[in-house]
Each structure stands twice: as C-alpha cells, then as structure tokens.
A protein has these predicted regions:
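Sec-dependent bacterial lipoprotein signal peptides
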Residues: 1-27
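Mature, structured domains of secreted/extracytosolic soluble proteins
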Residues: 12, 28-677
Length: 677
C-alpha cells in the first residue's frame, strides 16, 4: 500500500513538472495549452479509490446517497477531502444521531459537496487563508498549517480537521485524494448569529446591537435575480476571442474586523459599552466636529448614523464578503513587484464616504517592527511617517465559527478608525484601486480573481476550465447604470493588466458609476490606467455630469507624435534625475503618466521573463480630470462611446483607478518627481 502511494505521488509530481515544462514552451497571448504536452497515467478513478478503501466506507455511502458517484467516475480535476469512518463516528455523536440512516438526502448532498473541490490541490499548493476554489457547496475551505500528534507538519482545514500525513497527495486518474481526520462543516447561519456565539467579542457585538447596525447584516441573496434571463455573450478583445456570462447569483456579503474584549481592555481599559462610546467620541468628535454638539451625538441616540459609536462600529465593517485572509490583498500578489511595493487594496466601509487600506507587508526596508508577510489595515510606514496600522489575524480559535452564510469576521490586534491620522496621513497618498475592487459584488459573488491566471482559454471557450469572464446586467452592480456590455475579464498574468484582470466596455456603451470617496476636501486628480490597443475606440468622459476635455482615444500610445513621439525612452531607469523629472513633467502637461513601475506582466502564457508597465508605450495612466471634490458627497464618472469606426465591437478598457491629492500630483510643479510605483 505505502509503495503504491509513493508511486502515485511520484506520478503526480512528474505530471506537475511536465505541465510546468509545457507551459514554459508556450509563447504569445493566443496560444492554447497543447493536450499532448500533458502527462497522463492510468489508474483508478476517485470513485474506485473510495470503494476500494474500506476506511472511507461511510463517506462512500454519503457520496452514493448524494448521487455524485458518477461524477467521481468521470474524467475531471478534483480534490477529495475524504473523512475517515472514525471521523464520521465523532460527527454522528456530535449531532446526536446513530448512523447515516438518520441523515436526510439533503444532508448527504451537503456533506458530499463540502468535501469535494473542482480543482486539483496538492498540500504544497495550500497556502494560509482559504483554497482559491470554493467547494461544490460554494463555500471556501480555510487553510492553516500546524503539527499533528506525531509532530508532522500538516495542513489543517477549517481549523478542526487536518489532512492525514501518511495518506496525503494520493493521486487518482481524475484528481487527488486528501483524507482528513474530521468531517468538515460550514455554518448556515448569518454573520450576526455567528458573531453572537463567540463570547470573546461580546463587547463589540453588544455595540453592533446597540447601534442597530446588526439589522443591516442579514441580507444574503436577491431571489428576484435569475441568471437564466441573460444569454452568453461573445466578444473579441484585441486578438482574444472570449465569452462572458452573467453571474450565477446576486448575493450580498459582509466582512467585519473585530477587536476582542481582551484587546479593548488591554489597550484602552475598556470593559463596557459606555466606555467604548467614550473612546468613539474621542476619535470622531475630532473627525466630525460639526456633529459633536448635535442631538445625534448623545449616548441615548446610538442608532443615529452620525453617533460616534455608530460611526466606530460601521467603520469596522465592509459591505462585501472577503472570502479569506489571503483575499484581503491581491491574491498571490499577482503582477506586483513585491520587493518594491507592498500589495495594497482599498475597500469602502459601512461608514459613509470612508475607506480602509489593506496592505500585505513585503518591502523589508519599511517593515519597522511589523512582520513581513502579514496583512495590515491603515498602515503607512515610510521615510516621513511610521504608522504601523492594525494587524489582521489569520484565524480564530477552533471552538468558534468564523465564516457565515453571508460573510465572515476577522480578529484584529487594535481598533481601526477613520481618525484624523487616518484621514490626513494614511489616506493622504495616491489611492490606486483595481477596478474590480470598486464594485463589492465582484468579491462577494466569487468573481474577482477567479480561475488560473497562467492558462489561456480556447477561442470562445464555454467550459470555464481555467476560469470565467462575466458581464453585469444593468442593475446588478450598486450605483452603476450601464448600456452596452460591462465585462470582467478573469486574470491572466501575461496580459497588460494591473493585478492580472481588467474590466471592459463593449458595444454602444454608456456607463455611469460612483467613484470611491476621497478622505478630505480639496483638489484631486482622477486617473485611469489602461492598455492601448489598435482595436480599442474613443469615449467621452464626464465627472458629475460635466464633460472633461476631449474624447479619450484608446488607440494612441505614448510614443504617438501627439504625446512623446520619438522622445520616448523605454528604460526610464537609465535617465538622470533631471531627465526623469522632465519626462514626468512633459507627460503630466499632456495629461499622462507612465504605467505603474511596481506592476508587471509575464511575457507570454507560462512565461518566466517579465516586462514592467512603466517601460511600455501601451501601458500607462491618463488624467481623466482634475477637480475639486467634497468628501461628504457622492461623485460619479460617466463614460460614453463616441466612436463609430468599429461599430458595436467598440471596446473601452478600465484597468485601475487612481485618486491623487494635490499634495502628491503637485510636486512636479516644484521640480520634484512623483514616485513612479
């Protein structure tokens, strides 16, 4: 048995190596993986494995009751986390039942789907956070690492079970078997009910209830939305022939960042709700002085959205379901030079017109006392400021549930707040946001960064083997009104896209959407990053209903005669400081900036060499407008097609958005250089 398992593991490693080699030989954006390059071996299917191993007879019976054995008998790429019979004995005892006979067919279906994932994962590919593919019950499995009772380094799942060391990574014809020590369970409760059951966060939860914000956290799904109403859409972007579908569901989600009772007591001496209210007053009376003497400020009016405690709690919550700790920042740091800049994402909070900054620490130069690899909220550590921010904990105690049907919560090692420090220092920077982060629905509905970014899809693919592209029917996205097709293109690490993915408009499009809030009033540049292509078109941009400059022509690159022409220099690192300053100032005066110097793409599918965006004429940023912005008002961008030369196949790319205060963009007027990252 052991020898057979070792041979299977060898075959899996060989298959992985050969796949990697085949990827390395592919070039060009349109190349498809050649099936002849893949190593395949004959052996038992997953269904046969289960039937041939009596120690999994209970799970085998569960799968048969769920009528899923045929699936495991067919070709595919699955991971099966099969619980042992001993695990089921403990599960039955926990539920107060005797055997599988006491389970309903629906129970069996849920259990089977919870332990099956439609992708192959070796233990070496399971990083802390969650698996990047949901299980067949559409829930994400939490991953952590620890030692088993024999001091073997093993993978833990949902903090309660671990993969059995002596049986891990056992390959079968259609996937990998990863036997586990316990039956995996997922909560079917809403987020407030999950939080209520954890006594370690009782004070924050009491504040959630007292402010009435708890009632906002029960939304789950729009049952009036029906994906079948929307047909598949075929389109061509440059040379890539693709399809997009409407999202399967329209779900709502929430993510809370919660200081435990012990954190509040240890750091601030807070042990009751009134003390927490006083702390909130200390913070928010300074941020919102106009409300400090209002009736809304009183302790008797905690449900008023202007109340300090209400603001305090609201700022700790996002109106999106961030599926795991590793999803708080760009997944796998895709397309980011992590030695130069920390991967960062910004998300709006439930406190109106505010955002939180999430950062994975990777640049050692500015680590300070923080831990490299960890994720922090509202951190700014550079030559001018040393604000460490609040650390997000990877997990919670195994006796408590962290994820709910409509979201999850994370422990944090301090409070977070939209304080004067956050507003005036942390947020006083170039705020860069991948367009997929602006719309919460993309994260909540498992759309953002889905799929495998290293593979190219066949022309007009409908299998979604490597991931899916989506389009959003008008009304699906909050604060968005759209004619034409608004598409999310899944990540490809060899496309000219920041963080690998992009959003595109097709057809006779006309879209209006709310942009993220700025932290304070003043003059702001609104920039957009994109890739120029000859197949793209022309659009007029509006800010708050007013047209901004001449129409934007996406067929023009930086070396066009109207911009830099022959003065373009690709290798900006060879320039002197004076030359670089002049280059940046010249571009700025024409309304452009080079692409992100901290972003890159691979040179072809499966490539190993890379190209930095700032060195290319086709990947750059354009200034959409320079405007005075009120932080307490909603602001909107409108993009309307004005090109007819490409008919209804007219295309407009939205890669990333930048909100830049005058304190940043104005430095070039004084002969300085804005950092190019």
């Amino acid at each position: 048995m052991k020898g057979n398992m070792n041979m299977k593991k060898f075959k899996y490693c060989l298959m992985t190596a050969l796949v990697a080699c085949s990827l390395g030989m592919m070039t060009g954006c349109s190349d498809e993986p050649d099936a002849s390059n893949y190593y395949t071996f004959t052996g038992e299917m997953m269904s046969e494995y289960l039937k041939n191993h009596s120690e999994f007879s209970e799970f085998t019976a569960i799968v048969e009751r769920a009528e899923m054995m045929d699936l495991l008998s067919a070709y595919g790429h699955y991971t099966c986390f099969a619980p042992t019979n001993e695990a089921f004995e403990r599960y039955y005892q926990k539920r107060g039942i005797r055997s599988i006979d006491d389970l309903t067919d629906a129970d069996c279906d849920t259990i089977a789907r919870t332990h099956l994932v439609g992708n192959m994962y070796a233990t070496s590919e399971m990083n802390d956070g969650v698996l990047t593919t949901a299980n067949m019950n559409r829930r994400y499995i939490e991953v952590s690492h620890d030692l088993d009772s024999d001091s073997n380094a093993v993978v833990f799942l949902n903090r309660s079970a671990h993969i059995i060391f002596t049986m891990q990574d056992d390959s079968v014809e259609n996937g990998i078997m990863q036997p586990v020590t316990e039956v995996l369970e997922s909560s079917n409760r809403m987020l407030p009910d999950v939080m209520r059951s954890n006594p370690r966060i009782s004070l924050f939860f009491s504040a959630l209830v007292a402010t009435g914000l708890v009632d906002s956290l029960y939304k789950y799904r729009d049952d009036n939305y029906n994906a079948k109403d929307y047909p598949r859409y075929k389109y061509t972007s440059h040379v890539n022939k693709e399809t997009a579908t409407a999202p399967d569901e329209k779900k709502y989600g929430f993510t809370a960042f919660v200081p435990t009772d012990s954190v509040l007591n240890t750091l601030y001496g807070i042990t009751n709700l009134e003390q927490l209210y006083q702390k909130a007053c200390e913070i928010y009376d300074a941020t919102y002085p106009e409300d400090a003497s209002s009736e809304a400020h009183d302790y008797a009016n905690l449900t008023d959205r202007r109340n300090p405690l209400n603001r305090f709690v609201a700022y700790h919550i996002l109106e999106r379901d961030v599926k795991g700790w590793n999803y708080l920042t760009p997944l796998n740091d895709i397309g980011i030079i992590t030695t130069l800049m920390n991967p960062v994402d910004w998300y709006e909070t439930m406190l109106p017109h505010t955002m939180m900054k999430f950062e994975r620490l990777t640049v050692r130069k500015f680590a300070g006392t923080s831990t490299v690899g960890q994720r922090y909220i509202n951190r700014r550590y550079d030559d001018d400021y040393q604000i460490l921010g609040t650390q997000v904990q990877r997990s919670i105690e195994k006796e408590y549930t962290q994820d709910a049907l409509n979201g999850r919560y994370f422990y944090i090692d301090d409070i977070v707040a939209f304080s004067e420090t956050t507003r005036d220092i942390v947020d006083n920077c170039r705020i860069r946001m991948d367009f997929s982060t602006i719309f919460p629905e993309l994260m909540t509905n498992d759309i953002r960064q889905n799929g495998n970014p290293k593979y190219q899809d066949p022309d007009y693919d409908e299998t979604a083997k490597y991931g899916r592209n989506y389009y959003f029917p008008d009304g699906y996205l909050k604060n968005v009104k759209c004619a034409g097709y608004f598409i999310y293109r899944r990540p490809h690490d060899y496309y000219d896209c920041y963080e690998g993915d992009e959003m595109n408009l097709f057809g006779n499009y006309d879209i209006t959407f709310k942009i993220p809030p700025v932290p304070y009033e003043g003059e702001w540049q609104v920039r957009m990053g994109y890739a120029q292509e000859p197949t793209r078109g022309i659009a007029q941009v509006y800010f708050d209903g007013k047209p901004q400059g001449i129409p934007l022509d996406m067929t023009i690159a930086l070396n066009d005669a109207s911009i830099l022409g022959s003065s373009w220099v690709s290798d900006y690192t060879s320039m002197t400081t004076t030359q670089l300053s002049e280059d940046q100032k010249t571009l700025k005066n024409k309304g452009y900036y080079r692409g992100a110097a901290g972003g890159y793409r691979y040179n072809g599918a499966g490539g190993t060499t890379t190209t930095v965006f700032a060195t290319q004429t086709q990947t750059f940023r354009i200034v959409l407008c320079t405007v005075h912005m009120d932080p307490n008002q909603d602001h909107f961008l409108r993009i309307r097609s004005v090109s007819s030369k490409m008919g209804n196949d007219n295309e407009f790319m939205l890669d990333y958005l930048e909100l830049v205060p005058k304190s940043i963009y104005g430095v070039t007027d004084e002969g300085q250089i804005e950092d190019m990252l």
